[in-house]
């Protein structure tokens, strides 16, 4: 399998599928073509395809492919049909009520970050075979240069994040597809003039030295006798835009629900092939069972515009905003702890006045947005924290200042005549700013806040609070449905490989959209995000329905997004595939 994995990786890298470019479509086309060449998908062409991302101006797609043991979901029903000779109508009804098929989801993304950091070596950054020859001591860290000389690592843009893991998952899906097809061919026999599926064992784990990671006792306890002969369903999902705003994963929730219903699937576990680091011992790999949440609070301050000479009669919005920043930036009291994991405190990413040029007057408005990473805090709790800090700052201000959330401002605007026409034009311009002028979500959020204040002719001092996209819900697999079953998967993974399973992946990930606990769909974020709707959204209710527990678990990689990006050859081609094979059969 080593050759197949490296061949897939080589071809994926050659697509140079930089995020937010049409090159992402080149990768999608190549991946779908790879699957369609497999005999299994020639037999079942309806089990792979491209799912267009709704409303995406670049017309990108999610690539999906499903391998499913026919008859696995109808085992009891098939036996009953043969024994009792039930009618076709009864047979169809039984199929509709069949037990769903245990399903593992291989998930990842096919977009990569740009290669600018490679400097003179950039033209070869996407060439798996030649990039190493164009890297040297000057362009690499000492550790990376040592790895380069060792020959034990593969270099190049995307090999680590995350085309390497994607290549492994594609190769394993192809392997499983071949075995299932062979099983189907052998198990179709004619009895009493009817074709009946006769279940036969399928050995989906190849014996070999890479299988020795679990001793016999562990294997029998965790996987059970004959577990390697079981066969459920394996769904591959690769999305675009993970490196930007996760439009691919957000847009694919309806795909997941649709496939679940169409093919009678039971999503037991998702494995995101995000590259993992190792501890200092070089052996223990860090795996995550959750993903940190991310919010982007936006604060717009409107002061009272006067010439500097009349300072005491005015109000400088920069003074208020700077105090809000000082009260929240790096505030350790806001951080969260989960075991020995600690979240990062609030970090302001943008703070400035909104004057377009220089003059001898105070700025009318100033604004900023702040990066907030959460473990369990909700948008409502984050909003309450910032509003509390804002009101505390305003207690020291002599001028009266109105504090309002975005939803309050918007509801005031809705009461005014001409609002409908105003909002239609606003939404048209909003799309133009995002899609044609390539403004960012925070920039357009601030533009919407200012435009709405102007529509109301609101000229009194005020602070408006809201959120800008993106929003990544904090998630823990242990809070999903079937927590006891997931505990078994954790135990199995720990037996298969030397790992340290942590909870919150510290960088945001698409796994935030695998599910949220039932009853946590609070609308506070939606109603206080000016861009929520046409330009940014995801199906919150679908997350509560799906609830797919997951591991962020990929091959061992280093220096992703840097010129020294690399993936360990042994981890990629031997260790990771072997562990995934066995983990599949723990789930099935």
Residues covered by each model-derived region:
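Extended hydrophobic secondary-structure segments that form protein cores and membrane-embedded regions
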Residues: 105-107, 233-240, 270-272, 463-467, ...
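Short helix-terminating capping/connector loops at secondary-structure junctions
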Residues: 42-45, 97-100, 220-232, 262-266, ...
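Metal-dependent amide/peptide-bond hydrolase catalytic core
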Residues: 278-280, 289, 295, 306-588
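Short, conserved micro-motifs enriched in small and acidic residues
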Residues: 22, 154-167, 315-318, 570-574
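Short, flexible helix-coil linker/hinge segments at the edges of structured domains or between repeats
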Residues: 125-142, 274, 281-298, 337-348
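Acidic/His- and Gly-rich active-site-bordering loop/insert found
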Residues: 1-157, 185, 218, 222
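Acidic/histidine-rich catalytic neighborhood of metal-dependent amide-processing enzymes
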Residues: 153-188, 193-290
């Amino acid at each position: 399998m080593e050759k197949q994995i490296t061949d897939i990786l080589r071809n994926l890298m050659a697509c140079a599928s930089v995020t937010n470019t049409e090159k992402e479509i080149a990768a999608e086309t190549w991946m779908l073509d790879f699957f369609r060449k497999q005999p299994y998908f020639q037999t079942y062409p309806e089990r792979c395809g491209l799912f267009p991302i709704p409303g995406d101006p670049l017309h990108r797609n999610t690539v999906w492919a499903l391998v499913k043991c026919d008859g696995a979901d109808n085992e009891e029903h098939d036996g009953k049909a043969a024994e009792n000779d039930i009618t076709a109508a009864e047979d169809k009804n039984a199929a509709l009520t069949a037990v769903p098929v245990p399903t593992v989801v291989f998930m990842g993304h096919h977009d990569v970050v740009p290669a600018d950091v490679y400097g003179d070596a950039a033209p070869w950054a996407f060439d798996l075979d030649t990039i190493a020859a164009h890297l040297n001591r000057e362009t690499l860290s000492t550790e990376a240069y040592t790895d380069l000389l060792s020959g034990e690592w593969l270099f190049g843009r995307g090999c680590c994040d995350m085309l390497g893991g994607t290549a492994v998952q594609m190769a394993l899906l192809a392997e499983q597809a071949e075995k299932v097809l062979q099983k189907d061919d052998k198990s179709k026999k004619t009895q009493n003039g009817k074709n009946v599926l006769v279940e036969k064992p399928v050995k989906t784990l190849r014996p070999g030295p890479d299988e020795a990671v679990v001793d016999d006792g562990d294997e029998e306890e965790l996987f059970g006798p004959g577990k390697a002969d079981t066969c459920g369903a394996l769904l591959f999902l690769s999305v675009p835009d993970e490196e930007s705003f996760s439009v691919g994963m957000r847009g694919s929730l309806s795909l997941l629900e649709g496939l679940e219903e169409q093919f009678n699937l039971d999503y037991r576990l998702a494995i995101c092939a995000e590259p993992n680091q190792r501890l200092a011992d070089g052996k223990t790999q860090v795996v995550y069972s959750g993903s940190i949440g991310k919010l982007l609070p936006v604060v717009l301050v409107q002061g009272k515009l006067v010439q500097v000479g009349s300072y005491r009669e005015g109000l400088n919005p920069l003074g208020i905003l700077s105090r809000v920043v000082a009260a929240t930036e790096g505030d350790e009291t806001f951080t969260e702890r989960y075991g020995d994991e600690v979240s990062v405190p609030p970090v302001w990413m943008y703070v400035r006045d909104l004057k377009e040029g220089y003059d001898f007057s105070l700025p009318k408005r100033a604004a900023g947005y702040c990066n907030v990473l959460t473990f369990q805090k909700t948008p409502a709790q984050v909003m309450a924290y910032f509003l509390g800090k804002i009101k505390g700052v305003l207690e020291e201000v002599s001028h009266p200042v109105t504090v309002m959330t975005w939803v309050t401002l918007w509801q005031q605007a809705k009461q005014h005549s001409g609002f409908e026409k105003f909002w239609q034009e606003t939404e048209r311009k909003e799309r133009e700013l995002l899609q044609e002028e390539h403004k960012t979500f925070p920039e357009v959020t601030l533009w919407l806040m200012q435009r709405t204040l102007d529509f109301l002719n609101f000229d009194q001092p005020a602070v408006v609070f809201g959120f800008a996209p993106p929003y990544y819900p904090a998630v823990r697999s242990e809070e999903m449905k079937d927590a006891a079953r997931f505990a078994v998967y954790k135990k199995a993974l720990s037996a298969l490989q030397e790992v340290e399973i942590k909870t919150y992946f510290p960088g945001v990930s698409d796994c935030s959209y695998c599910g949220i606990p039932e009853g946590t769909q609070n609308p506070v974020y939606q109603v206080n995000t000016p861009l929520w709707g046409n330009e940014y959204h995801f199906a919150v209710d679908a997350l509560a329905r799906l609830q797919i527990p997951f591991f962020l678990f990929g091959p061992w990689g280093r220096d992703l997004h840097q010129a020294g990006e690399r993936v360990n050859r042994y981890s990629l081609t031997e260790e990771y595939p072997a562990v995934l094979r066995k983990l599949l059969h723990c789930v099935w």
